[in-house]
Amino acid sequence: VKNQKILLHACCAPCSGAIVEYLVNNGAKPVIFYSNSNIYPRGEYDLRLNECIRYAKTWGVEIVEDQYDHDGWLCCAQGLETEPERGLRCLECFKFRLLRAAQYAQDNGFDVLTTTLASSRWKSLDQVNQAGFWACSQVSGVTWWPQNWRKGGLQERRNQIIKEQNFYNQLYCGCEFSQRTGSAEPSEDLKSKADPCQVQE
């Protein structure tokens, strides 16, 4: 893929560090696509985005921010709120984000799409690839790159870069439902939130 135009969907800086370094050092120069409407609250989203921007600058890599649409993401996750991590909600979340990445890749002439989600040991690699292949099947001219970014020493290098860069390293995946299974407490009463998927009268 060295001579192909690569779009790298990035979930956060800690997961991106070793992947960006590896790609650039091997002659590829990806464009980072930050599409993470799952992240809640908005301040958390911005914090993770700013860390990605900071790291991209160190490598001279372009980063593109997708529109933040948490209400749209909540509609995608509706009915799956109580699913465990690596459950059906995670699969639908990956599909939501990677479809947006695939659409951007198609519209902007990219050949290959891959994601930093595949670097996290907390995520199902099978789910990530299922979502990636599906997303690329919905567009034309974009190939899914099912790379296992946990192998070849990249997991160890990932942890080194987190320390070297002093990255903000989040305690939960991103959405308010994953807060329940992470170390962070939900920042507000989830039950009191209005349902964005219901028609308001």
Language model feature labels by segment:
Residues 1-201:
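Nucleotide-activated chemistry modules centered on ATP-dependent adenylation/adenylyltransferase
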